[in-house]
Amino acid sequence: MEQEQDTPWTQSTEHINIQKKGSGQQTQKLGRPNLTRLMDHYLRIMSQVDMHKQTVSWKLWLSLRNPTQGSLRTRALKQWKSFNKQGWTN
């Protein structure tokens, strides 16, 4: 059986306190997630998303500044499709 990898998300949301009863049985009690860890994880993910957005917009800016024949064709096709969707209404 494959063991699940411990990620910051699972670490913070699945705190399990195991308590032994007198009979030797184990009970599991879910604890409260550590808010600091949740916030750190959230901020880390959002930072990665922002970096991706910046990279995409930078690549777009570069492609507009130094367009290749392929990028010009793609851009023209996108504009043509959006124009056709709007129709001939003025």
UniProtKB/Swiss-Prot annotation:
Residues 65-87 are annotated as: Mitochondrial targeting sequence. It holds the Pfam family PB1-F2. It comes from the Viruses. One of its GO terms (biological process) is symbiont-mediated perturbation of host apoptosis. Residues 1-29 have a biased composition (Polar residues). Keywords: Apoptosis, Host cytoplasm, Host membrane, Host mitochondrion, Host mitochondrion inner membrane, Host nucleus, Host-virus interaction, Inhibition of host innate immune response by virus, Inhibition of host MAVS by virus, Inhibition of host RLR pathway by virus, Membrane, Modulation of host cell apoptosis by virus, Viral immunoevasion. It is found in: Host mitochondrion inner membrane; Host nucleus; Host cytoplasm, Host cytosol. Residues 1-31 are annotated as: Disordered. The record marks N66 as: Low pathogenicity. Its main location: host cell. One of its GO terms (cellular component) is host cell mitochondrial inner membrane. InterPro entries: Flu_proapoptotic_PB1-F2. Plays an important role in promoting lung pathology in both primary viral infection and secondary bacterial infection. Promotes alteration of mitochondrial morphology, dissipation of mitochondrial membrane potential, and cell death. Alternatively, inhibits the production of interferon in the infected cell at the level of host mitochondrial antiviral signaling MAVS. Its level of expression differs greatly depending on which cell type is infected, in a manner that is independent of the levels of expression of other viral proteins. Monocytic cells are more affected than epithelial cells. Is not encoded in all strains, and seems to be dispensable for replication. Oligomer. Interacts with human SLC25A6/ANT3 and VDAC1. Interacts with host MAVS. Belongs to the influenza viruses PB1-F2 family. This is Protein PB1-F2. It comes from Influenza A virus (strain A/Memphis/4/1980 H3N2). The gene is PB1.
